[in-house]
């Protein structure tokens, strides 16, 4: 049976899994998101410790962002200008793929969740399928014609600017890039 590795790279925690399908989980772990070196080291350690018993044929990574998903970009696979301290310009895709010597693919955390709901959860039969999340951040992912939305049409919902009455509420927002976007005011 073919086994796959999965990484949910979240702003507060990482979850790693080895499975053949959603209801056949062979190994799983979770740990807090700290520094890139420590956190990615724990990811690599989990898969290497389990590689003899549960060898994976590929790795899927859903990651907080923003992430560069343009395969022609020199920073493809990187977490880019994230407000998460210490994580900006982290090459998560190649660091994990190279260390584990396995093919890997990366998408946004919300697209990963949207795809999971579309294939196995509440989004089955819905196309397009939209997934909204409020957690460490605010975001959304979308599936159209069975594929995640990328590029200029990707819905960075957490960073949409909101109408803001500066007289009633002078708070400028905490987002270092947009100030009073949805996430910056939450």
Model-predicted regions and their roles:
Residues 4-19:
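N-terminal beta1-alpha1 ligand-phosphate binding loop
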Residues 17-21, 27-30, 37, 105, ...:
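Glycine/GP-enriched mid-protein hinge/lid loop-to-helix segment characteristic of carbohydrate kinases
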